[in-house]
């Protein structure tokens, strides 16, 4: 079976949820991989005073998570906020150092790749888990099997589809239909000896090493959780995921009070660079005002600024480094301090998605004509990003950022830096709509002030083109659940890179993986052949990507052509309307010695190298 065709053949796709791959929209954080976040449910009042401070210690690094964490189990997490904490406790084979998009070995001391790019052999570093057990290759085998076979895994497709690890299938009846599903215990991941791990792929995959930097692939002590065949488990998965996660990272679990705070403490026997802080404390604050007040009261060392309280005129950029990070200062703040500042273009995209089973094509196109991405970024997001006209971010776009810009300016069919309401009205009238034949559409947004303002602008514009847009907000997790159940018509979400390649983004536009009748659709747009030729074009292009996975120039050229085909198909049918590419901005006080994250975002950064001076 061809790699990446497995999901189609089995009729199942894994739940993919921005974070990783995960990210934030400047108001707060909540990419699920389908990403989104907002200023949602309060964990405090707007004072931002004492929320999440019970566990704080003076020697801790104080952070804010702007969304609710859902799990501490690496195979289960799909949201950015959980990923930020998991990143501190679990070390996979590879790593994005300070979120730079070029990977380095982490648990891997060395590795070899076969001439046909299908066998990867890793030598492991000498490390221990937080319970004192030595990390062995068998622990990785067990962790990969959990990721693939556990009912608690949200990322089985990472192994079977994205990487394409060799495996066998068996026939099972699912909902009255026979399907080929993974046969437990057949995965091509082998412990050659205690410190040598071998991974066998069905076919080459150009982003294998980048994929293995994802925390889902982190080792877990063999037999710790009994949620796969052959293991009874020392703890239940519920306990492991909430109160007893055992990892191998620079910090170990201390405690977690869902919706309020979490803390990890420095692990004394860490094999790498020992943490410079006693621990990291995360206050969970989803409300923008509370988040801002918390930081202004100096309860956070490193923080974000909600867009409502952000003034672009207070940014002073002093340098731009080789990772594209703009470094400088911001201030002064409300509390009189001048903060350190960093801004970097995130490898991600925020967009409006359409359930094509319920929103007709003329309506989708009319929304695209009405949307002026430049206006949204400048007036609503206060220039904290770049207008998005392609789904793939600029830094990884085929042909580079210049090709991205050229396509946007010269080929985007719905108006570059222009709201074309006349065209929107025409396409609706041609489809039979008018003042006496209006259409009502529900737009569900995650709880975010900036998305609420964007939706209001769009709603007012669409009134004149016979579309009555009803805007409703939902907590992030509720929005995702409704999406997976096919209950959304139009929605706001985002996606940030699991690995820095276009196929990681364009998989959301692979029609078979958008079917919400599946258990875990990767996106919620229901792009089916009955929608027209563009769906077939997108599906064939994605299959071309899957058929040419090798890290060679010829295969890359073929993939690049297919990437553009998928972008064009999305332009035609408007399955997803790109809105903006986020600028990740962080702020920190002078007592913090901190290298800010690069393009892979905060959820990929470990905090063991951060140092603290004396707080004011």
Annotate each language-model stretch with its function:
Residues 195, 204-207, 212-281, 289-290:
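Gly/Pro-rich hinge or "lid" segments in bacterial periplasmic/extracellular proteins
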Residues 109-156, 291-294:
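Aromatic- and charge-enriched surface segment that lines or borders ligand/interaction sites
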Residues 64-113, 246:
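N-terminal lobe/hinge region of extracytoplasmic solute-binding protein
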Residues 160-227:
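Surface-exposed binding/hinge segments that line
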Residues 239, 263-326:
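Ligand-site clamp/hinge motif
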Residues 359-460, 465, 565, 614-616:
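Append "and occasionally in soluble cytosolic enzymes with long acidic Gly/Pro-rich linkers
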């Amino acid at each position: 079976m061809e790699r990446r065709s497995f999901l189609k053949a089995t009729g199942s796709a894994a739940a993919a949820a921005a974070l990783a791959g995960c990210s934030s929209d400047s108001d707060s954080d909540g990419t699920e991989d389908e990403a989104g976040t907002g200023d949602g449910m309060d964990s405090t009042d707007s004072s931002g005073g004492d929320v999440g401070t019970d566990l704080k210690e003076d020697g801790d690094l104080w952070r804010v998570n702007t969304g609710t964490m859902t799990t501490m189990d690496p195979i289960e997490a799909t949201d950015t906020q959980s990923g930020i904490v998991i990143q501190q406790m679990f070390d996979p084979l590879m790593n994005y150092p300070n979120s730079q998009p070029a990977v380095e070995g982490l648990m891997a001391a060395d590795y070899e790749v076969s001439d046909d790019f299908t066998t990867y052999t890793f030598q492991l570093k000498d490390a221990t888990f937080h319970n004192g057990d030595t990390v062995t290759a068998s622990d990785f085998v067990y962790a990969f099997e959990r990721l693939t076979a556990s009912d608690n895994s949200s990322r089985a497709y990472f192994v079977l589809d994205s990487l394409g690890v060799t495996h066998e299938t068996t026939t099972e009846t699912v909902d009255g239909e026979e399907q080929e599903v993974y046969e437990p215990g057949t995965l091509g991941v082998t412990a050659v000896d205690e410190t040598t791990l071998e991974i066998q792929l069905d076919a080459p995959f150009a982003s294998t090493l980048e994929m293995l930097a994802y925390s889902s692939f982190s080792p877990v002590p063999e037999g710790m959780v009994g949620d796969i065949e052959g293991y009874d488990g020392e703890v239940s998965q519920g306990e492991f995921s909430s109160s007893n996660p055992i990892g191998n990272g620079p910090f170990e679990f201390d405690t977690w009070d869902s919706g309020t705070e979490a803390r990890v403490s420095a692990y004394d026997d860490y094999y790498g660079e020992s943490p410079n802080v006693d621990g990291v404390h995360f206050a969970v604050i989803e409300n923008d005002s509370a988040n801002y007040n918390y930081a202004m009261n100096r309860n956070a060392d490193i923080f974000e600024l909600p867009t409502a309280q952000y003034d672009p005129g207070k940014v002073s950029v002093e340098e731009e480094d080789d990772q594209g990070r703009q470094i400088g200062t911001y201030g002064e703040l409300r509390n009189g301090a001048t903060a350190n500042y960093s801004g970097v273009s995130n490898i991600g995209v925020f967009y409006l998605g359409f359930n094509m089973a319920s929103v007709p094509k003329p309506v989708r196109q009319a929304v695209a004509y009405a949307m002026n991405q430049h206006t949204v970024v400048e007036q609503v997001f206060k220039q904290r990003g770049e207008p998005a006209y392609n789904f793939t971010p600029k830094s990884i776009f085929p042909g580079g950022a210049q090709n991205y810009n050229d396509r946007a300016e010269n080929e985007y069919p719905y108006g570059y830096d222009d709201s074309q309401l006349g065209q929107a009205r025409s396409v609706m009238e041609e489809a039979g709509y008018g003042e006496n034949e209006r259409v009502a559409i529900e737009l569900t947004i995650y709880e975010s002030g900036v998305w609420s303002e964007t939706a209001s602008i769009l709603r007012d514009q669409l009134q004149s083109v016979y579309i009555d847009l009803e805007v409703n907000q939902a907590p992030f997790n509720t929005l995702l659940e409704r999406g997976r159940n096919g209950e959304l018509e139009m929605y706001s979400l985002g996606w940030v890179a699991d690995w820095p390649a276009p196929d990681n983004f364009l998989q959301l536009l692979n029609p078979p993986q958008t079917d919400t009748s599946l258990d875990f659709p990767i996106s919620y747009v229901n792009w089916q052949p009955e929608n027209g030729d563009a769906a077939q074009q997108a599906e064939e292009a994605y299959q071309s990507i899957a058929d040419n996975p090798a890290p060679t120039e010829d295969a890359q050229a073929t993939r690049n052509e297919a990437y553009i085909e998928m972008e064009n198909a999305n332009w035609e049918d408007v399955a997803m309307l790109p809105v903006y590419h986020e600028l990740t901005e962080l702020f920190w006080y002078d007592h913090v010695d901190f290298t800010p994250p690069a393009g892979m975002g905060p959820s990929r950064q470990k905090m063991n190298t951060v140092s603290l001076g004396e707080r004011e």
